[in-house]
Amino acid sequence: MSENRMPKITKTNEEWRAALTPEQYRVTREHGTERPFTGPFLDNKRHGTYKCVCCGRALFRSDTKFDSGCGWPSYFAPVDPDAIAEYVDRSHLMVRTEIRCADCDAHLGHVFPDGPPPTGLRYCLNGTAMTFEED
């Protein structure tokens, strides 16, 4: 877990608010969650790279995306393990592993140990926290 890691990109709340939509700010800066089956990219089948909406860091490739049925875009591996920082999340009377962008500390979603091979992991992302760059 990355409890004491410092983000590489820091901005004030006002700077983040100016750069993001209200929903992007709520999800990424206030650790919000979009409603299931409502976010962008859930049904995206194009080939490309999913990037952090806050800083543009490459996070996931389309070839690691799978339909988990949970209502959020899901991936079995990041493009680079160093792209994601993991934190213990004890909110909502649960213990989960939160994932954030390693460069700007944006809340992305959570990772669960119930994914497909080869990793057995399910990175469950808020689509609002990402952009998509087609190949």
From Swiss-Prot:
Question: What SUPFAM superfamilies does the database record attribute to this sequence?
Answer: Mss4-like (SSF51316)
Locate the active site: 124 (nucleophile)
What cofactor does this protein call for?
Zn(2+)
What superkingdom heads the lineage? Answer: Bacteria
What InterPro entries does the database record attribute to this sequence?
Met_Sox_Rdtase_MsrB, Met_Sox_Rdtase_MsrB_dom, Mss4-like_sf
> How is the cofactor bound here?
Binds 1 zinc ion per subunit. The zinc ion is important for the structural integrity of the protein.
What's the protein name? Peptide methionine sulfoxide reductase MsrB 1
